[in-house]
Amino acid sequence: MKRRILACMMVVACMFSISAYGQITERERPKEWDNLIEGGRFMDRFMPIPVKGEATSNVWGAKDVLPRYVQNGIENKEFSYWGGNIVKGDDGKFHLFVCGWPENSPKGHMFWPKSIVYHAVSDQHNGPFKVVDTVGKGHNPEIFRMKDGRYVIYVINGQYVSDSLNGPWKAGKFTLDPCGKKIIEGTSNLTFARRDDGSFLLICRGGGVWLSKTGLTPFYQISDGSVYPPVEGHFEDPVVWKTNVQYHLIVNDWLGRIAYYLRSKDGLNWKVEPGEAYMPGITKYEDGTNENWFKYERLKVLQDKYGRAYQANFAVIDTIKWNDLPNDRHSSKNICIPLTKGRLMSVLNKDKINAQTKTIKVKIESEDGFDAQKDMDLKSLRFGASEEVNFGKGSKVLKTKKSGDDMIIFFKGEGNGLNDKNFAGKLLGKTKDGKLLFGYCRLPGVDYSEPAVPEKD
């Protein structure tokens, strides 16, 4: 009996310790998520990581991340790395701007407020990245390029600006004008997306939307509230990006260790997609090796010329942050995980698509690594509103027609689910070798105009 009581006390103490640290809690998922098919949630886009070098256990880390491939992303036994993002330079190389601090710092991971931004470079988009320069003080950098070609690195409470990825970098601060509106949870953890006219959209930590004419001129808040999902969560680490079709946003519930995916036609009005955007357990290699990192934070994406995300990089840690102490076996790094890239596609119908539409014509483009005329499993394809195709429904293929190197697919209009609330159609299915295939396209009859940057004296 005494042993049972002692065991219960130990379990309660352990649970209290974790709760006190504020590191994890269990979130109940909506029941409807159980019916999502592959490709219905963003998390399905994470692909196995190519193997580089040999997996080793002769490195820091809890047993759940051993053995591992240290050449993925950036890793150094003498430094703890955290958030950052990658851009492809005009030199053809990949440039990672990441924050970090010495592993033997007096407070371990809690030394992060004094972190430094490093410039690391690799010939490959997934590393290994090697530090070549120091930018300056700052935490959780995000780099973007302005219309005039200059680069801007955002850090908490500051910025760095340069004509070149190689510097020199000039320190400064952003001007954030709430325009009389309530600022939502402060102005840290900012994330940026360049609009077609060269202006910039910003999402702040609390989910507020801001606009700037250039990215350096003042940002003005245009939203009255948060655009995040209306569910319980301790949200942070938003990442926003824009493609040739729409805006994308992922935000992380750090306490629940679950992230949410949203889409928007204009950057102001957002639609929450079902299913997890990411969660622990997504680091898997092509040879079957798994790295079970305790936490994934500071997601950023690497984009192609159409804005499509083809790689995610995360700050990861092997334990509770407060347990990462100086000169111990724990630390953090920044890793890279490939993403399935959406296909290039367009609707050829001229009239608005709805329940009365008889046939939907969709053009799928061929590109490097994808032959639209040979690679698709046509029987698996569904097209229509994401609310339908994410759950295995939607319009089915009626017939096909070749168009140059591309393919035009005629879908039956029945079951497309598209209405006035939809601004993008979704294609979902598989390739002939069983891999995920998806894509989004704009729809006829939809107004894609975006909110203007406020004019102020």
What are these regions (language model features)?
Residues Q23-M345:
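Carbohydrate-active catalytic/glycan-binding domains of CAZyme proteins
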Residues G342-K363, A452-D457:
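Boundary/junction segments of secreted and surface-exposed precursor proteins
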Residues I364-A372:
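Short amphipathic, basic-aromatic surface patches that mediate peripheral association
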Residues A372-N390:
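Short, surface-exposed alpha-helix to beta-strand junction/turn motifs within ectodomains of secreted
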Residues V389-Y440:
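Structured beta-strand segments within beta-sheet-rich domains
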